[in-house]
Structure formats: C-alpha cells, structure tokens
Design a protein with these regions (language model features):
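Low-complexity repeat regions of mature extracellularly deployed or surface/particle-associated proteins
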Residues: 1-219
Length: 219
C-alpha cells in the first residue's frame, strides 16, 4: 500500500504463510524520487498478520510526518515485523505472539514512543531511537531465548528505556547511549530461569540505571 495525505487511516489484514505486507505513508514514489513532496501527518496505520514466515513492514519518510500511530500485531511463528517512522510525536507498537519472531522499530524525531511486546519462544527485539525525549518499552515473556537491543544515538537526550524479560530461557539485553545522548534513564528487569546477561554502555553524561535480576540461574 502506498498513500499520502493528512489524517490518513490504513488498515491491513493478512492470513497465511510466506507473505509480505508493505505500507508506505507519505512516500511520493517507490523509487524515492518524490519523497519530500507529500505528508502523512496525523495518520493511523494498523497491520494484522496471522500465519508463519511472514514479513510486514510499515514506513514513512522524513519531512511532514508527525502525530502518527503505528500498530502491528502478529500471531504465528518465524515472522519479521518492522516499523520505520520519522519526525515527532509518534507512537509505534509491535505485538508478536508465537515462536522465533523478530521485531524492529527505528525512529528519527523527538517525543516519540516505541513499544515491542513479544510472547512465545525464542524472540528478538531491536529499537533504534535517533531523537530526544522519547520512551522505549520492550516486554518479552515466555520460554527460550529472550534477546533485546536498544540504541540511542545521536542527539538522543532525555530518553528512557523500560525493558522486561520474564520466563524460562536465557535472557540477553544490550542497551547503548552514544555521544550526544545525555540524561538517559534505564530500568531493566530479568526474571526467571536461564542465564541473565546485560550489556549496558553509556558513552555520555548524566544517566540513571536500575537493573533487577531474579531467578536461580547465572546473572
């Protein structure tokens, strides 16, 4: 789906296996030749996928893309979901239920909210935040490996990250604040059986970190 304009509502539903859903809001052309000529302000983009081995991605392009709401819901195994949003005051959410699923959100803009929720066995969540005053939420619950990666860079001041990994299986969290991303806040909770591993690095100033690891396994 390729569309443009202010106040747009897009809803897609896909059922089956080995399918691809692509949503472009505000993109003037697929070859990017008209990227800066259209807007997608105040848009609501909702994608629902049921099945296995599917790919779903939603994307806006830089310029005139504020106040958007992106929601992707996936039920099934071996699925890959991506949201690529730009500009300010946007909210993006990916919810995945099933096994061996991957989710990735990236955004460049201020005052944004990024959320990934994963329930099942073996999953990976990745969020890139390239703006200020934004909130990152990742919740992973179930069995198998829990893997999460959060990057704040560059000029990502006053960003907060709340990361929860619960259940049986190994838990691995990587959270980074690079130069130009001051005043960061992290709360990380890892709970349940399996190894608890956290790799946290701040290449910046003024940050608060809270890490809680509960369970009978290595931490």
């Amino acid at each position: 789906i390729q569309t443009k304009g202010t106040g747009t509502t897009i809803t897609t539903k896909q059922a089956g296996s080995s399918n691809v859903t692509g949503i472009y809001c505000g993109l003037g052309s697929f070859d990017n030749s008209l990227v800066n000529t259209h807007n997608c302000d105040n848009a609501t983009i909702t994608a629902t996928v049921t099945g296995n081995s599917n790919i779903v991605y939603s994307q806006s392009v830089w310029s005139n893309h504020g106040d958007q709401t992106w929601i992707t819901t996936v039920n099934g195994n071996d699925n890959y979901a991506v949201i690529d949003m730009d500009e300010d005051d946007n909210t993006s959410t990916i919810i995945q239920t099933g096994d061996d699923n991957d989710a990735w959100i990236l955004g460049s803009g201020d005052d944004n909210v990024y959320k990934i929720e994963q329930l099942g066995d073996d999953y990976y969540a990745k969020i890139y935040a390239f703006g200020d005053d934004s909130d990152v939420w990742i919740t992973q619950e179930g069995t198998g490996d829990h893997n999460a990666y959060v990057l704040n860079y560059p000029n990502a001041d006053n960003n907060s990250t709340r990361l929860i990994q619960k259940g049986s299986g190994n838990k691995d969290a990587d959270v980074f604040w690079y130069s130009g991303s001051d005043d960061g806040d992290l709360t990380l909770t890892q709970q349940g059986n399996g190894a608890h591993t956290s790799n946290i690095k701040f290449y910046t100033d003024d940050y608060d970190v809270t890490v809680v690891q509960k369970g009978s396994s290595n931490k």
